[in-house]
Structure formats: C-alpha cells, structure tokens
C-alpha cells in the first residue's frame, strides 16, 4: 500500500494501516531510542515514548508540499524525545539534590 493511503487509513483509526506505518518507521524509532539511551535513559522506556509520539504524530499530520511525512515524523519524534529527556534530567536533579525546580 502507498504511504499516502496508509496515512489516510491510519488517521481513520484503521489498526492494520497504523501497524504497517509503525513497522515501516520502526528503524527510526529504534535509532532515536538508542541515541537517548546513551544519555542514561532506559532503551525500552524511550522506545515506548517514541512509539507514542509516532502515533500522535500520524494523527496530527497534515500533508503539505513543503513537508514530507518522513521528515515530519523525524522532527516530531526528535522534539518529543528531547522534551522527555529534559523532564528526566529535571527529575534526576531534584531527586539527587533534594531541590524543587520550577513549578
């Protein structure tokens, strides 16, 4: 099935289409999880977070001539995992030093 068609069907909550998209993009999710696991995060936790970000990104995706689906997914996952990592660091600092940072 063509990528455009898979995206449209996945957005209509068709499980098989979402599964196929997920399978196609699993190498990206794994590479991003591996990158962040090098910063002290658990690989499985990061991969699950990346999977959740992927599903949300599929639902949010709007086709535009200037943005490919793969590029959009990569940016959304990178940004989402960066935010997740920052929250992890904040929590680690608070626990280590007994501090309350921010709100």
Regions found by a protein language model. Name each.
Residues 1-91:
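Alpha-helical promoter-recognition and RNA polymerase-docking modules of transcription initiation factors
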Residues 85-103:
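Charged, low-cysteine interdomain linkers and short loop/connector segments
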